[in-house]
Amino acid sequence: TLPTQRFSRSDETDGPGTFFGGYRTIAEHYSHLDAIAANHPTLAKLVDYGDSWRKLNSKPNGYDLKAICITKIRPNSSDCALNPNVDKPRFLLMAAIHARELSTSEMAWRWIDYLIDNYNVDTEVTMLLDSTEVWVIPMVNPDGRQIVEQNNISPYLQRKNANTSQGNCQNPPGITYQHGVDLNR
C-alpha cells in the first residue's frame, strides 16, 4: 500500500506556468519532463514520439508529443527504446486525452515525482522500476489543452484535439460545439 501523503497546492496556485487556480500549463508540464530526464539519467528518458495535429499541419501552437520512460536504465540495454523487442515488461499511463480533463495530467505529474523520489527509498517502487518500464504521457492532447488554457478565469470546455479539417465550429468552444477529433473514438 502507498503511504498517505499530504500535498499542499498553496505555493503553486496561480503561479507562473499555471491557469485556472493552479493547473499547470503545457509548457510547465514539458519543462517538468525535461528536468526529470536531465536530473535522473539513470532512471528516466524523455521520448519525442511524434507531433500534434497542429504541428503536423504547420499550424500555430503545434507541439511535440512527449512521453517519459521511468525505469532503472541499464548500460548498453534496450531500456526505453522505441521498439517492441525489449527485456522488461511495459506499463503505459496516458493522461489528458480529453483537453478539458485537467486533473489527470496533474496526477501523472505527481506519480512521476513519486516514482523518481522513492527509488531506493521504497522497496516496492525500487522493485517496480528495476523490473518494469513505466511510460507516462502526461499530456496526450496538447493542441486541445492549449485551447482550454486560453481562458484563465474559466477553462474552455474543449474535449477534442484542434483538427479543423471538418470546418470551424463555435469559438470559443462550448460543451457541444467544437472543432476537432475525439482522440479515443
Regions found by a protein language model. Name each.
Residues 1-185:
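M14 metallocarboxypeptidase catalytic domain recognition
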